[in-house]
Amino acid sequence: QLSVTLGDRHILHDINVSVPVGKITTLIGPNGCGKSTLLRSMIGYIHSPRECVTILGKSLQSYSQNELARQMAFLPQVPNMPKDMTVEELVYCGRYPYQMWWKNTAKEDREIVDYALGITKTNHLRNQLIPSLSGGERQRVWIAMALAQQPKLLVLDEPTTYLDINHQLEIMELLKRLNDEQGLTVLMVLHELTQAV
């Protein structure tokens, strides 16, 4: 059971959530109902007084940062946008949990980055700066970075916010394809019931 208190205010009390492996799980509700707070608590971004979160059968607290990053990738609703970074450089950031300070980028890292750019259809953008991209392109690039982590669990906080309907559909289709083809477990927050269907 998960409970969250922020200051003197009890936000969540005795919540039980199970996310099935290999499925897409969506937390849905109106703005301000606590979806993002629940999501962030479930992945350890907000501290819960009762540490009771497990990921793949292992307590969240028992993971090192690198171990956790190899299991789970998280995309917040509005990621910090680097102004002077290319798409390829950003996607390479997803490889950090696998890199050692004394080693250069390995062939495997390059192959995984190429794969992530390919599956998200962002390969043609690899040399562009992040601020030059449209909203839908940016979101696909952030997902490519998350995929470069090779996570077993992809967690997204309102991945279609601020996108027009075409880009929303594009992102939802990409997530469905990743789940269907790779068995990637996806946990996300949405406030539009129609997107979850």
PLM region descriptions:
Residues 104, 129-133, 137:
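Conserved ABC ATPase signature
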Residues 51-59, 68:
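Conserved ABC transporter NBD signature motif
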Residues 92, 107-125:
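Conserved ABC ATPase "signature" region
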Residues 154-158:
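Catalytic Walker B motif of ABC-type/P-loop ATPase nucleotide-binding domains
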Residues 150:
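Conserved catalytic motifs of ABC-family nucleotide-binding domains
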Residues 28-30:
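The feature captures the beta-strand-to-loop junction immediately N-terminal to the Walker
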Residues 43:
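Helix-to-loop junction immediately C-terminal to a conserved catalytic motif
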